[in-house]
Curated annotation (Swiss-Prot):
<keyword id="KW-0812">Transmembrane</keyword>
<comment type="subunit">
    <text>The system is composed of three essential subunits: KdpA, KdpB and KdpC.</text>
</comment>
<keyword id="KW-1133">Transmembrane helix</keyword>
<keyword id="KW-0067">ATP-binding</keyword>
<keyword id="KW-0472">Membrane</keyword>
<dbReference type="GO" id="GO:0005524">
    <property type="term" value="F:ATP binding"/>
</dbReference>
<dbReference type="GO" id="GO:0008556">
    <property type="term" value="F:P-type potassium transmembrane transporter activity"/>
</dbReference>
<keyword id="KW-0406">Ion transport</keyword>
<keyword id="KW-0633">Potassium transport</keyword>
<keyword id="KW-0997">Cell inner membrane</keyword>
<keyword id="KW-0630">Potassium</keyword>
<protein>
    <recommendedName>
        <fullName>Potassium-transporting ATPase KdpC subunit</fullName>
    </recommendedName>
</protein>
<comment type="function">
    <text>Part of the high-affinity ATP-driven potassium transport (or Kdp) system, which catalyzes the hydrolysis of ATP coupled with the electrogenic transport of potassium into the cytoplasm. This subunit acts as a catalytic chaperone that increases the ATP-binding affinity of the ATP-hydrolyzing subunit KdpB by the formation of a transient KdpB/KdpC/ATP ternary complex.</text>
</comment>
<keyword id="KW-0813">Transport</keyword>
<dbReference type="InterPro" id="IPR003820">
    <property type="entry name" value="KdpC"/>
</dbReference>
<dbReference type="GO" id="GO:0005886">
    <property type="term" value="C:plasma membrane"/>
</dbReference>
<comment type="similarity">
    <text>Belongs to the KdpC family.</text>
</comment>
Length: 193
């Protein structure tokens, strides 16, 4: 009986050592050496203080800021520990209420709703944590942000263009705008004037 369990125990210990200790240790050292910013969460600093991550969305609802996608996380928006979509189907009345609520917020902030609203401004993402919006969603908000900041639309559009990332490797994904980075650039541009 002892000879039956010995190989099982040896394989178990070896697999735990390799997959639970050696592999994670090697990947941690590799990540810290080759991609230190990404391995530490792609943190964004302002004035020597961490203000967020380039990978996790934040809630902006003041008219002078660009707004990101809705967050479906609970108990609070953009809760990284509670990542997940709303799973609301297209016929669910709760989705309709959520979209109407966001449209009302856009209207209350002075956004012109005469043009079609980009879908990423009124719906949540699958993760509920998206830090980026489409260039169309950013462009849709330019007039409101420029008016709230007393800046020229052209200056705000230039910042949007400067913070628009293209497709990864030229083919993967869609062009996108990181909302936190864009809002920090807006603050810096306004402070410089």
């Amino acid at each position: 009986m002892k000879s039956l369990f010995r190989p099982l125990i040896v394989v178990f210990v070896v697999l735990v050592a390799v997959t639970g200790l050696a592999y994670p240790a090697v990947m941690t050292v590799f990540g810290q050496a080759v991609f230190p910013a990404q391995a530490n969460g792609s943190l964004i600093e302002k004035g020597g203080r961490v203000v967020g991550s380039a990978l996790i969305g934040q809630q902006f609802d003041a008219p002078q800021y660009f707004w990101g996608r809705l967050s479906a996380t609970s108990p609070m928006p953009y809760n990284a520990a509670g990542s997940g979509g709303s799973n609301l189907g297209p016929l669910n009345p709760a989705l309709k209420d959520q979209v109407k609520s966001r449209l009302d917020a856009l209207k209350a902030a002075g956004t012109d709703l005469s043009q079609p609203v980009p879908v990423d401004l009124v719906t949540a993402s699958a993760s509920g944590l998206d830090p980026e919006i489409s260039p169309a969603a950013a462009d849709y908000q330019v007039a409101r942000v420029a008016r709230a900041r007393k800046m020229a639309d052209a200056d705000v559009r230039r910042l949007v263009a400067d913070h628009t990332s293209g497709r990864q490797f030229g083919v993967l994904g869609e062009p996108r705008v990181n909302v936190l980075k864009l809002n920090l650039a807006l603050d810096a541009a306004q402070a410089a004037h």
